Amino acid sequence: MFDVTLLILLGLAALGFISHNTTVAVSILVLIIVRVTPLNTFFPWIEKQGLTVGIIILTIGVMAPIASGTLPPSTLIHSFVNWKSLVAIAVGVFVSWLGGRGITLMGNQPQLVAGLLVGTVLGVALFRGVPVGPLIAAGLVSLIVGKQ
């Protein structure tokens, strides 16, 4: 039997490899493996908890330099007195807020996820962009279309 969803996933994985977006490509290949094996019974859990688990792993990666001591406390304290660091803090707050809006939008309008993913891959492939991820893109979309 012909599986259109599998074909779409393979196409997106190919776009990921072509655009040197290995994060997208590997993620899609893992989902393909889950889809074509008995692991497919885990899809309800992945759909419900996957984003939360991913954000936890991302947060661990971001906080690791603080926890390991690579980023000393003096550097953290200094970030509150340097104007460039204050701008970075403000931008970080704004981007985090956008990501929150993005999660809401993706949960309420899941049909936009494919468009966000394709747009991210095309941006990397055609404009030498960086795959910053669909959460921020979804947050920006939510500013235009609303987050309902």
Curated annotation (Swiss-Prot):
Predominant place of localization: membrane
Keywords annotated in UniProt: Cell membrane, Membrane, Transmembrane, Transmembrane helix
Location in or out of the cell: Cell membrane
Entry-linked Pfam families: DUF441
Key word Magnesium present: no
Residue stretches spanning the membrane: 14-34, 51-71, 86-106, 121-141
GO CC field: plasma membrane
PANTHER family in the cross-refs: UPF0756 MEMBRANE PROTEIN YEAL
Family note: Belongs to the UPF0756 family.
Name of protein: UPF0756 membrane protein YeaL
Organism: Salmonella paratyphi B (strain ATCC BAA-1250 / SPB7)
Species lineage: Bacteria, Pseudomonadati, Pseudomonadota, Gammaproteobacteria, Enterobacterales
